[in-house]
């Protein structure tokens, strides 16, 4: 746990321990099905499908994919490097989709195919407990299938599947070497505890004492992960891992509600209940995500957000997601059936679109501005603080993205394939100061929209905080204190990002140089064609549109287009990438304000 989070964690635990230690009445265990749904919920999902065009579209996606699974072979135990996760995730998707298709259609072909998939997985020698995410997703897969298809399955199949859940799913959590997730403060805690709780709830009739003790252990562990949402619903690991960690957190609490009639106090945590909004603002007008840290750029309707909407009785939480569905921006992800589970309880008639600005603080503060929500040409700007030592973080404090007129001008490259890096022998998960992680182009500083001093790495433990925001008709933006990240080279670095009434963007960096002279690089990554048209102006062109970057300050600067990166053999080559910016020389102790303005009009740039 990082030092700056310790006071927050202590306060959080003091206020939440009683909520999370609620006494659970296991005598209230519901009959099968009890994971996510009870018997009456099937009729509600069918009614939702029949009354809603969006629900009908999602339902048909799931059923069509389940139909495709009918002609596929069952998964086999094949590791990718040290992981079985791809296999476990695929089994979860297949079993969940097939089980859903069966309860919605009563077509036994889907149940039979899900049964074959579960029996095949039950025969695996193990579910790869050395990488426990693999165990957890496989356990959840078989738990859902066992529960939803309970009355279809033969006694022999039930016994085989339940035994596999117990022996290959739950029992490995007794090994401290494998089950370190119980003490983790990130997505592993959420995913792994969810898998264990699903397995325990599914087979509790068979081993009630064991399953109850395991559930209590998981619920004692889970609050550690809840700190990540403090103080206001942000998520430190970025959009990709929000979707992973939070979706499984939702799966966990929703199963407790349906099986035992309790949320175990999880829904009482204010910061957690605000976090759905975070993902709303990670969606950009181009239909992509703000993909900082180890995140991909894909974005679509996120079904776990519908649990928050159901819990808070506020369909506005998913108004943007409903637009995604309307525009057919839905991905066939493994937890998609929860859209139908949670959405069936919502009334969308009074749903409203969100405000145009958002800010969260905590471990990775982010400010977001959108000019609107219904056009791909809307302007989007986001800037982040944080530190490089956060789980899955890049060396990118002060970085930003900027979309305008349907183009993402300032980009983030996102994550690199983990397996490829591990095959090359790289300890890419190490976030210490001298880690090889910072030599990888996508995770190191040189690919991001940041400042660099003397070519040095940022201080990985330096926390950059958002210290001010503003939102008026003529001025929107945020101020980020970057000083802790540059402590070795500068006495003060404050970045102010401001959009005017025309959505032109100005980045102002207030710098007080350190005791030694410094070469300062102002960097931005883009997919646009780039041309230097004056010593202080760069012209970008993409898709027939133009954006000008103009430098202004009481110090001489050199406009620069950096040469293509010399990729190592294990690195993904980023096609059409240009790195543009300005280079300036500062004397020791020099105090200076530099501005870079981005505008479609050259004379106002």
Features from the language model and the residues they span:
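Positively charged n-region of N-terminal signal peptides that target proteins for export
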Residues: 1-4, 249
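Residues that flank catalytic or metal-binding motifs in active/ligand-binding sites
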Residues: 31, 134, 138, 192, ...
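Bacterial N-terminal signal peptides
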Residues: 7-16
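Terminal accessory carbohydrate-recognition/targeting modules of carbohydrate-active enzymes
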Residues: 27, 33, 371-434, 440-445
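CBM-like, beta-strand-rich accessory domains located in the C-terminal region of large
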Residues: 19-22, 322-327, 420-605
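Active-site-proximal structural scaffolding
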Residues: 135, 189, 242-245, 268, ...
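Carbohydrate-active enzyme catalytic cores, enriched for enzymes
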Residues: 180, 203, 244-409, 470-475, ...
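Aromatic-lined, polymer-binding surfaces characteristic
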Residues: 26, 34-49, 54-288, 295-296
């Amino acid at each position: 746990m990082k030092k700056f989070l310790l006071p927050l964690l202590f306060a959080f635990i003091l206020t939440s321990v009683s909520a999370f230690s609620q006494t659970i009445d296991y005598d209230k265990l519901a009959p099968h099905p009890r994971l996510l749904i009870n018997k009456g919920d099937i009729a509600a999902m069918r009614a939702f499908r029949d009354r809603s065009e969006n629900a009908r579209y999602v339902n048909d996606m799931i059923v069509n994919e389940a139909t495709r699974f009918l002609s596929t072979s069952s998964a086999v135990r094949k590791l990718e490097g040290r992981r079985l996760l791809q296999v476990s995730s695929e089994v979860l998707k297949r079993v969940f989709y097939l089980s859903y298709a069966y309860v919605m259609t009563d077509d036994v072909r889907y149940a039979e195919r899900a049964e074959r998939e579960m029996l095949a997985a039950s025969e695996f020698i193990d579910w790869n407990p050395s990488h426990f995410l693999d165990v957890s997703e496989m356990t959840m897969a078989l738990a859902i299938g066992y529960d939803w298809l309970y009355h279809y399955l033969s006694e022999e199949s039930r016994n085989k599947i339940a035994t596999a859940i117990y022996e290959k799913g739950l029992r490995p959590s007794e090994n401290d070497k494998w089950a370190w997730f119980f003490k983790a403060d990130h997505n592993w805690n959420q995913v792994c505890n969810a898998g264990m709780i699903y397995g325990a709830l599914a087979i509790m009739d068979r081993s009630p004492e064991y399953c109850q003790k395991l559930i209590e252990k998981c619920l004692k562990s889970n609050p550690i992960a809840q700190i990540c949402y403090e103080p206001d619903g942000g998520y430190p690991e970025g959009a990709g891992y929000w979707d992973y960690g939070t979706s499984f957190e939702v799966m966990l609490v929703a199963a407790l509600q349906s099986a035992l009639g309790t949320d175990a106090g999880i829904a009482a945590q204010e910061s957690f209940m605000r976090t759905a909004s975070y993902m709303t603002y990670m969606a950009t007008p181009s239909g992509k995500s703000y993909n900082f840290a180890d995140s991909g750029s894909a974005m679509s309707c996120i079904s776990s957000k519908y649990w928050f909407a159901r819990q808070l009785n506020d369909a506005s939480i998913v108004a943007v997601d409903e637009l995604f569905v309307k525009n057919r921006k839905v991905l066939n992800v493994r937890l998609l059936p929860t859209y139908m589970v949670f959405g069936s309880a919502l009334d969308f008639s009074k749903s409203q679109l969100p405000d145009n600005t958002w800010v969260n603080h905590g471990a990775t503060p982010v400010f977001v501005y959108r000019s609107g929500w219904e056009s791909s040409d809307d302007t989007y700007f986001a800037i982040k603080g944080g530190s490089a030592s956060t789980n899955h973080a890049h060396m990118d404090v002060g970085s930003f993205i900027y979309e305008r007129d349907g183009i993402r001008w300032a980009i983030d490259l996102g994550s690199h394939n983990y397996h490829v890096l591990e095959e090359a022998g790289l300890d890419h998960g190490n976030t210490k100061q001298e880690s090889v992680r910072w030599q990888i182009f996508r995770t190191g500083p040189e690919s991001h929209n940041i400042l660099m001093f003397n070519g040095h790495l940022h201080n990985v433990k330096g926390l950059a905080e958002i210290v001010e925001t503003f939102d008026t008709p003529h001025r929107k933006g945020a101020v980020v204190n970057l000083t802790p990240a540059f402590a070795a080279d500068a006495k003060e670095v404050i970045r102010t990002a401001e959009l005017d009434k025309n959505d032109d963007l100005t980045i102002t960096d207030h710098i007080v140089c350190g005791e030694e002279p410094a070469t300062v690089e102002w960097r931005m990554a883009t997919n646009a064609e780039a041309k230097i048209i004056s010593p202080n102006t760069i012209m970008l062109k993409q898709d027939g549109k133009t954006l000008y970057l103009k430098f202004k300050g009481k110090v001489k600067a050199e406009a620069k287009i950096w040469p293509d990166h010399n990729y190592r053999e294990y690195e993904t080559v980023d096609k059409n990438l240009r790195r543009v910016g300005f280079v300036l020389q500062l004397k020791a102790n020099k105090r200076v304000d530099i501005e870079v303005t981005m505008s479609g009009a050259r004379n106002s740039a």
